[in-house]
Amino acid sequence: MPGCPPVIHYCTFCQIVARQEPADVVYEDEEVVVFRNRLRWVPVMLLVVPRRHVTQEELWRDMGRVGEVAVQMGLTHCPRGFRVVSNFGFDAMQSQEHGHVHVLGGTFLGEYA
């Protein structure tokens, strides 16, 4: 798999990037893949992931292209407003080790989403 480490443990996002797991991909380029989250708490729930396997901390130290694409996807899919968020660790309900950001929108989000 280009960009992902040798398989030590299973990484769903590495599998999606490699097209070995199904996903509703809405955008991709050389560095980033964007797909719809299978969970749907709000109308638009996109996951923006780097092709290269990195941790959340590594991703946020150098947001670069992932940040640019997250904002672009938010503006495209949620023109009335959106949130870009990440979960760090168990208490924040981070379920994937592969660094990623969520783009949430498509409705009034209220104080918390």
Describe each region flagged by the PLM.
Residues 1-113:
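HIT superfamily nucleotide-processing domains
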